[in-house]
Amino acid sequence: MSEQKSSNQMWGGRFASGPDAIMEEINASIGFDRKLYAQDIQGSLAHAAMLAKTGIIAAEDHKQIENGLKTIRKEIEEGKFTFSRKLEDIHMNIEARLAELIGPAAGRLHTARSRNDQVAVDFRLWVKQELEKTAAALKNLIEAFLERAEEHAATVMPGFTHLQTAQPVTFGHHCMAYVEMFGRDLSRVRDAIERMDESPLGAAALAGTGFPIDRHMTAKALGFREPTRNSLDSVSDRDYALEFLSLAAICAGHLSRLAEEIVIWSTPQFNFVRLSDAFSTGSSIMPQKKNPDAAELVRAKTGRINGSLVALLTIMKGLPLAYSKDMQEDKEQVFDAAENLELAIAAMAGMVRDLTVNVAAMKKAAGSGYSTATDLADWLVRTLGLPFREAHHVTGRAVALAESRKVDLAKLSLEELQSINPAITAEVFGYLTVEKSVKSRQSFGGTAPQEVRRQIRYWKKRIAKA
């Protein structure tokens, strides 16, 4: 037989008996929402101050509530607070302790407030603060890439498509590609903060309240731009959580692409980079191994963060307005994604700064795979006036000849090239080096070292203001 208890919950006035033990277990969220304690106290302090200012509660009650909440915050921070599953969540745990500390005045704190708008403001505050931390972490990662890009603006490496050698680029240019990616991530963070910068506190359960509250006062006290404008939406909205998870998933995708490249580049077969000992591990059986575990774990975090996004999208997809208990399941997804994104960004910033770049190996690889074939085609267009499609065909024949000879394009003799097109002159050989190739790519956003340095200057100014 299931266990029944008399109802002593704060909401239990209309219940003749308490919840089943299993109900208590499934209903409790204190195991994870205790993470919101600071935001819950912050919101309650603002709410209590507003209640006093508007004359809804007495100044003496407000003073007791304020002192009690500050005592509770100190107890939690010092590890002296006892959390109870029977009290369900962080809100009830704090309110119960407040009643122990100050007595009946504690019961006035919840005037003109519901747990629906209470949790909405707590969670929104937490996500907003987490987004600010994410922005700072992304700035640090971007700065790490700018440092490496500046150092290697002219370091030649192969550019790839389909993971096949395509054209020479510079390592600095490759680093700047990630600056662009993480710069977009940073923009998404800033956009998300702007969109969510409204306070739901005062929406009450769903319909607002008949008390003469001042929602603008609490919004300002909590650092929001303004209060939300619809009480139904205020308590049922979790777009800010979904948007956080969405931008986290996109950012994690960028981190995963970078991690994959680091894993590949650090293999002996590529040998482009060497990870520092600080971000590597060894093997329990093979003493020679140096494994890129940090990069691999960052790559794996992407699946976890993507899963959190899909989970919350699925939770929210069919909920009628306004609040449903399903929404209690939102927090663990966001907490987990935030923790793992923060860890992944920090790990990647450390790896990027500590990477040892093998300039010689990169340059050697840059010249392989007939990477200057496009330069030959471009020369045929510019110098001989060939239509590009014809130049493409001529170059293809030159590549086939070089392959049959097992030499690079630049190692073909002038006579061999002229056997394909008699108009080719010795001038062409000056355009078939990897250095000349990257230097010639001077178009806006190109890989020429001078253009890479220009983009670095642009991003340094932009990041300083971000």
Swiss-Prot record:
Q: Which pathway does it serve?
A: Amino-acid biosynthesis; L-arginine biosynthesis; L-arginine from L-ornithine and carbamoyl phosphate: step 3/3
Q: Name one GO cellular component term.
A: cytosol
Q: Which domain of life is it from?
A: Bacteria
Which top EC class applies here?
A: lyase
CDD domains xref list: Argininosuccinate_lyase
Q: Which GO terms describe its biological process?
A: arginine biosynthetic process via ornithine; L-arginine biosynthetic process
InterPro entries associated with the record? Arg_succ_lyase_C (IPR029419), Argininosuccinate_lyase (IPR009049), Fumarase/histidase_N (IPR024083), Fumarate_lyase_CS (IPR020557), Fumarate_lyase_fam (IPR000362), Fumarate_lyase_N (IPR022761), L-Aspartase-like (IPR008948)
Catalyzed reactions: 2-(N(omega)-L-arginino)succinate = fumarate + L-arginine
A Pfam family (short name) is: Lyase_1
| Keyword vocabulary terms for this entry | Amino-acid biosynthesis, Arginine biosynthesis, Cytoplasm, Lyase
What are this entry's molecular-function GO terms?
A: argininosuccinate lyase activity
Q: Mind telling me which SUPFAM superfamilies this protein's record contains? A: L-aspartase-like
Under Enzyme Commission nomenclature, its number is: 4.3.2.1
* Annotated localization: Cytoplasm
Q: Does the keyword rRNA processing apply?
A: no
Q: Provide the family line.
A: Belongs to the lyase 1 family. Argininosuccinate lyase subfamily.
Entry-linked PANTHER family: ARGININOSUCCINATE LYASE (PTHR43814:SF1)
Tell me what this protein is called. Answer: Argininosuccinate lyase
